[in-house]
Regions:
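A conserved short coil-to-beta-strand element within the FAD-binding core of flavoproteins
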Residues: 168-181
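Glycine-rich FAD pyrophosphate-binding loop
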Residues: 46-70
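Active-site-adjacent segment of FAD-dependent monooxygenases/related oxidoreductases
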Residues: 66-70, 74-157, 176
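General small-molecule cofactor/ligand-binding pocket signal
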Residues: 91, 165-167
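N-terminal Rossmann-fold NAD(P) dinucleotide-binding loop
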Residues: 40-41
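Conserved dinucleotide-binding and phosphotransfer motif residues
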Residues: 50, 160-162
Length: 181
């Protein structure tokens, strides 16, 4: 049929995620999200919680490492992840709980330290008050997690949501909308 997208969703290299084969016809999805990075997956989960049927299309194979752009998740994003039920699993991922998160500027890799931005380690994130973002009144402080760890966790939560269809190895090259959607 002219109005259907057909794609076989391959099993990602992630142990406990099984994706389904997808055949999505016009009208079976309310929203098309292009890109299964952190923003696309978060949007899909949020819409699905509200009963919106979402199809997420990604050019990469699921589980393929991303071109990393994220290394630190803000408090506001963590609050949203808390609302979506994914914050606890994100907090457990990334750097070890006692690993220093400070940002240091040096003249060279082993050169003179110019300045340091203190960021509490994961185990002290809720209690420590030293650093640029520790005084905020928030139930979810910022979290240091690289996108290579963040994305698989978001994918795992997104695929578990009713109303979310994930299609990988598919590139959107054109989009047409008419009076019917």
């Amino acid at each position: 049929e002219k109005d259907e997208i057909v794609a076989e969703v391959v099993k990602p290299e992630l142990p406990d995620i099984i994706l389904r084969k997808s055949k999505v016809k016009s009208g079976q999805s309310d929203v098309l999200v292009v890109g299964a990075g952190p923003v696309g997956l978060t949007l899909a989960m949020d819409l699905a919680r509200s009963g919106v049927r979402v199809t997420v299309v990604e050019v990469r194979r699921f589980g393929e490492p991303p071109n990393v752009k994220c290394n630190h998740v803000s408090a506001r994003s963590m609050e949203n992840f808390r609302r979506l039920g994914v914050a606890p699993s994100l907090r457990e991922a990334g750097l070890p709980e006692d690993y220093p998160n400070d940002v240091v500027f040096r003249t060279a890799m082993t050169g003179t330290e110019l300045t340091r931005i203190p960021i509490p380690c994961r185990k002290n994130r809720y209690t420590e008050r030293g650093g640029p973002d520790t005084e905020w009144d928030t139930p979810e402080p910022p979290h240091r997690i690289n996108q290579i760890y963040l994305e698989p966790l978001l994918l795992k939560h997104a695929v578990a949501q009713d109303g979310v269809t994930l299609i990988n190895r598919t590139q959107v090259t054109d989009f047409v909308q008419d009076e019917h959607g």
